[in-house]
Design a protein with these regions (language model features):
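Short, charge-rich amphipathic segments
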Residues: 8-27, 52-60, 120-126, 195-209
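N-terminal [4Fe-4S]-dependent radical SAM core
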Residues: 4-52, 100-101
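Canonical Radical SAM [4Fe-4S] cluster-binding loop centered on the CxxxCxxC motif
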Residues: 48-83
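Alpha-helix C-terminal capping/termination sites
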Residues: 5, 275-276
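Conserved non-cysteine loop/helix-boundary elements of the Radical SAM core domain that shape
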Residues: 69-270, 275
Length: 279
């Protein structure tokens, strides 16, 4: 916003620091991120759009989650009719896009956890996208394979068959006690297994997510998680900072989370470590 308002990078940085009390390092990161986003935006034309498909189901509901998502244990019966309705909506959406003369640049299947669906259900959704939208200009097809315990070789073959170019495996942490605290029903070993399967399939782009500030985590634990992510050599590593959201179990149950200084220590480790590793 500050740059768009005509401020120089130096003025924008000073504005962030003085008005929002952003630390100098975070202000510099914000400017760098803004410049990267602006560069990407300049490539887009007015008729370019992105298509997002949401799969609101997960194996379990994470403690930090406030998304419209349900555990399949509680809502298993809703999955088949949801897929039916979704495929119909994709078809209708494709017709609207054609009539409007719009061009699809990216397709993103998020959630929830899309890989909660069966291989057959994922095949149906991706087939609906292929038959409903012109993919000629589509540069990226992403599917969130967020929960390692939902990833199977069969599902990954479906993704590759449909030309998925990017998958995201989101361990969030490798610390066993933290995984339990956030309500995950998998172990760090399950992440190893999932990443091995993903590597075998040869996806063009693989991302991994971590969250700084999860319940029961420590600065040392976060460092171990980040270092372990690096051993897989993913194309991207996305580090989120925990957001306290209304409706999440962290707030409703008062789960213990690291303090601001600890989270800052985590982030101060992440940035130089990732840059040194070439990210």
């Amino acid at each position: 916003w500050a740059l768009e308002d005509g401020k120089s990078p130096e003025e924008a940085r000073a504005y962030l620091e003085e008005h929002y009390f952003v630390t100098p390092s975070r202000a510099a990161l914000a400017l760098e991120t803004g410049a990267t986003a602006a560069k990407a935006a300049r490539r887009l034309e007015k008729r370019d759009i992105d298509v997002y498909v949401g799969i609101p189901f997960c194996p379990t509901r994470c403690a930090y989650c406030s998304f419209v998502s349900q555990s399949v244990e509680r809502s298993f019966a809703l999955v088949p009719p949801y897929v039916d309705a979704l495929c119909g909506e994709i078809s209708a959406g494709g017709e609207m896009v054609r009539r409007a003369g719009l061009r699809v640049r990216t397709f993103y299947m998020g959630g929830g956890t899309p890989t909660t669906l069966t291989a057959e259900q994922m095949d149906r959704v991706l087939t609906a996208f292929e038959t409903s939208f012109d993919r000629t200009a589509c540069e990226e097809i992403t599917v969130e394979a967020g929960r390692p315990d939902t990833i199977t070789a069969e599902k990954l073959v479906v993704l590759r068959t449909h030309g998925v170019t990017r998958v995201s495996v989101n361990p969030q942490t490798f610390e066993e006690n933290v995984l339990r605290a956030i309500g995950r029903c998998h172990t760090a070993a399950d992440i190893d297994r999932a990443m091995e399967l993903v590597a075998r399939c040869g996806f063009p782009h693989v991302n991994m997510d971590l969250i700084a500030g999860l319940p029961e985590d420590t600065a040392e634990g976060f460092r171990r998680s980040l270092d372990r992510c690096l051993t897989y050599g993913p194309d991207d590593i996305t580090v989120h900072t925990l957001a306290l959201k209304k409706g999440s179990r962290i707030l409703t149950e008062g789960l213990r989370i690291p303090g601001a200084e600890t989270v800052a220590e985590m982030l101060d480790y992440a940035s130089p470590t990732l840059r040194t590793a070439g990210y």
